[in-house]
Design a protein with these regions (language model features):
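N-terminal secretory signal peptides that target proteins for export/translocation
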Residues: 1-8
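Flexible, surface-exposed loop/linker segments and immediately adjacent secondary-structure boundaries
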Residues: 29-177
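Sec/Tat signal peptide C-region and signal peptidase I cleavage site
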Residues: 22-28
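Bacterial N-terminal signal peptides
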Residues: 11-22
Length: 177
């Protein structure tokens, strides 16, 4: 790994970027991923080994994570804005997780969106199932297609809701879907 890559990796891991965080293309490739800009938008598509695809909303602040240090991305720390994730069944042994300040959303073989804004994390499932819990709690909920949950700081129970079409459409439009 070059000195430049080590430098950017240390910044990424320490979470020292201010403002908009863009994952360095060389680091993404080192983790088995490649970025592609979406023409005419501020969105990017991150395609990783094993078929994982992440559509990144413009202005998102996130960090790619290799929890088991096998050279493949298996989690994302999301701090701002939203990601639309598609992790085909069996693509990531042990599943894929999105960690936010308010929640952990973990899935296998699914398509889901995670949005962080104004002290709240919202998770919505399009396909498959996603387990959601607060970082400091093992109690959580499991979302099915069409289900969503809004997680705010605190210890109260999480409430699964069927999201109205208007809310789903507004979220997916942010990803060009």
């Amino acid at each position: 790994m070059s000195a430049r890559d080590r430098f950017f990796r240390s910044l990424m891991m320490a979470g020292l970027f201010a403002g908009v965080f863009w994952v360095d293309a060389a680091l993404a490739q080192g983790a088995g991923c490649a970025f592609a800009p979406v023409a005419g938008t501020s969105r990017q598509i991150l395609r990783c080994q094993e078929g994982l695809t992440i559509i990144v909303e413009g202005g998102s602040r996130f960090t790619l994570v290799d929890r088991d240090r096998n050279g493949k991305v298996d989690a994302v720390r999301l701090r701002r804005k939203a990601l639309l994730l598609d992790a085909p069944a069996g693509s990531i042994p042990g599943g894929f997780a999105v960690v936010t300040p308010q929640a952990i959303a973990a899935a296998r073989g699914t398509k889901w969106a995670v949005d962080v804004a104004r002290g709240k994390t919202s998770v919505f499932v399009l396909r498959g199932r996603v387990a959601v819990n607060r970082p400091a709690s093992s109690a959580g909920v499991v979302l099915a297609p069409g289900d969503g949950v809004d997680v705010e700081a605190g210890t109260g129970p999480l409430t699964v809701k069927r999201w109205p079409a208007k809310r789903v459409s507004a979220l997916l439009a942010r990803f060009g879907q």
